């Protein structure tokens, strides 16, 4: 969930302000762009969840802090058809700012009161809550926040994708 910054920090103990970080980050991102789909797979239960959402006539989208150059090839690789995609470089701000969620809702003419936003990082929940969207913390994924998921102030915590289908909105 912390992207290249988090991976480089964990692997090499290097931070963005350190000498050599920019070069290392560029090399990493170039490599990632070439190989990101090599071992990529959707989390267990996600394909079925998306099929069920679509079968119900609902729409779903992707709102990520990952840049478009990485997002769109993965969407194509996994043969996904989201109604909307908002990447980290789509707007001038990214999560935890709520604006990417508001932008996505506006793009598909949807209301916050009728939406659910699920995420595996506290930034996701902060963005959803800021956009007044029902927030769901998922217990699968990267869970990059140092805070326990129970402390994220989510409207709901789920343990597997199938639980998302039964959500009744309360916001």
Per-range role (PLM):
Residues 19-20, 81-84, 112-116:
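Short acidic capping loops at alpha-helix termini that bridge into adjacent secondary structure
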Residues 55-58, 108-114, 171:
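Glycine-rich phosphate-binding loop signature in dinucleotide/nucleotide-binding domains
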Residues 116-156:
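Acidic, Mg2+-coordinating phosphoryl-transfer loop and its flanking beta/alpha structural elements
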């Amino acid at each position: 969930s912390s992207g290249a910054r988090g991976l480089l920090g964990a692997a090499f103990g290097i931070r963005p302000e350190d000498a050599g970080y920019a070069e290392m980050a560029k090399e990493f991102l170039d490599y990632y762009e070439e190989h990101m789909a090599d071992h990529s797979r959707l989390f267990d239960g996600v394909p079925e969840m998306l099929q069920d959402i679509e079968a119900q006539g609902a729409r779903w989208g992707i709102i990520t802090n990952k840049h478009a150059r990485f997002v769109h090839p993965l969407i194509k690789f996994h043969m996904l058809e989201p109604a909307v995609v908002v990447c980290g470089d789509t707007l001038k701000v990214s999560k935890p700012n709520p604006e990417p969620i508001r932008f996505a809702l506006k793009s598909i003419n949807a209301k916050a009161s009728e939406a659910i936003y699920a995420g595996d990082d506290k930034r996701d929940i902060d963005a959803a809550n800021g956009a007044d969207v029902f927030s769901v913390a998922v217990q699968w994924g990267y869970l990059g926040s140092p805070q326990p998921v129970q402390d994220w102030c989510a409207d709901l915590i789920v343990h597997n994708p199938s639980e998302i289908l039964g959500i009744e909105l309360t916001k």
